[in-house]
Amino acid sequence: ITPFRSMIKYAVDKNLNTQIHLIYSNSIPEEITFEGELENWAKSWPNLKLDMAITKPEEGKEPWNGLTGRIDEKLIQKLVSDFNDKIFWVCGPPLMVDAMEQALGKLNISSGKVRVEKFTGY
């Protein structure tokens, strides 16, 4: 999330005329890094849409009433209305990034519109 946080902060600070839709997944609610900051930006800057999903809500200490499950092609289709003129940025552990590239491929999103960064070690 850290690279995306920096990109979003820059866009908010400069009030850029660009649309950003962050789809952010964690295992449990307690793992949502920068949650308050992201929510504040989404409320105060109309160009940011924020969707957060939890994959294991039953294991968390905090209740979760939002999206559940992994980010996959079905969830992307549900949340993103139009794939034209969009660039998809993906970062995270290698297996997750690979799964996201496959999901985007199933949606016929060309690899030229997908930017990835794999973080190892977690």
Question: Where are the language model's segments positioned?
Answer:
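Hydrophobic/small residue at the entry helix of a nucleotide-binding pocket
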Residues: T2-P3, M96
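Histidine-anchored nucleotide/phosphate-binding helix
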Residues: P3-D13
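Reductase modules of NAD(P)H-dependent flavoproteins
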Residues: V12-D13, T18-Y122
